[in-house]
């Protein structure tokens, strides 16, 4: 005689509801990045970064608060981390947050004016791509 175990029908709805709630909370929480510097590690919201500028083997961060931070990593390393968050490398020395672009000027070799008033040069090979990105905003 074989015993047959009967499993109760388990309602997946509560677990699914909890999973969906966790996903929603994760999507709503601000994304952050850790910036290593000479005095320790700084955790900042990605949305607070307006642009980054290469300085040899260091990267200068420009924040929306007006503060700057010098990180002990190259711009290339941060480029890889920030591309999914609407950042574009428009020059070998500049990575910008597209959310803070105010204007693109074609004269004088081409440059971008950021919301903080800074003027960022655009490399010749990046101009066409930048213009298409701006048109799609």
Feature locations, PLM:
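Conserved binding/recognition cores within well-folded domains
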Residues: 7-115, 121
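Receiver (REC) domain switch/output surface
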Residues: 1-7
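C-terminal output/interaction extensions
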Residues: 127-137
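A general lysine-centric signal
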Residues: 92, 126-127
